[in-house]
Amino acid sequence: MSMVYANIFLAFIMSLMGLLMYRSHLMSSLLCLEGMMLSLFVMMTVTILNNHFTLASMAPIILLVFAACEAALGLSLLVMVSNTYGTDYVQNLNLLQC
């Protein structure tokens, strides 16, 4: 494994550890998810460019579309929760309430 792949994999693992450790605020969870998506995008792009996969060149673009949708939904959830509860603590959320 080259150093580029190792660094990208390390960035993904650090984002995953941040997501698992800092679960108290919704904003920090969203930032860790964005870090994971960014490292996946870079890993896919580097792999496709190194292996000359011309048919799979659309996959990173599709991943970016899903990441943008995830970010938009996450930010709208953050705004809704902060307007309703006045804070962005994850433990205040009860998913059983309507």
Curated annotation (Swiss-Prot):
Keywords from the named record: Electron transport, Membrane, Mitochondrion, Mitochondrion inner membrane, NAD, Respiratory chain, Translocase, Transmembrane, Transmembrane helix, Transport, Ubiquinone
Cellular component, GO, one term: mitochondrial inner membrane
Localization: Mitochondrion inner membrane
A Pfam family assignment: Oxidored_q2
The protein, known as: NADH-ubiquinone oxidoreductase chain 4L
Assembly and binders: Core subunit of respiratory chain NADH dehydrogenase (Complex I) which is composed of 45 different subunits.
An example molecular function term from Gene Ontology annotations: NADH dehydrogenase (ubiquinone) activity
Ranges that cross the membrane: 1-21, 29-49, 61-81
Coiled coil: none
An individual GO BP term: ATP synthesis coupled electron transport
EC number annotated for this UniProt entry: 7.1.1.2
General function of this protein: Core subunit of the mitochondrial membrane respiratory chain NADH dehydrogenase (Complex I) which catalyzes electron transfer from NADH through the respiratory chain, using ubiquinone as an electron acceptor. Part of the enzyme membrane arm which is embedded in the lipid bilayer and involved in proton translocation.
Family of the protein in this entry: Belongs to the complex I subunit 4L family.
UniProt keyword Chloroplast present: no
Entries under InterPro entries matching the protein: NADH_UbQ_OxRdtase_chain4L/K, NUOK/Mnh_C1-like
Organism superkingdom: Eukaryota
Lipid bilayer topology: Multi-pass membrane protein
Catalytic activity: a ubiquinone + NADH + 5 H(+)(in) = a ubiquinol + NAD(+) + 4 H(+)(out)
PANTHER family noted in UniProt: NADH-UBIQUINONE OXIDOREDUCTASE CHAIN 4L (PTHR11434:SF0), NADH-UBIQUINONE OXIDOREDUCTASE SUBUNIT ND4L (PTHR11434)
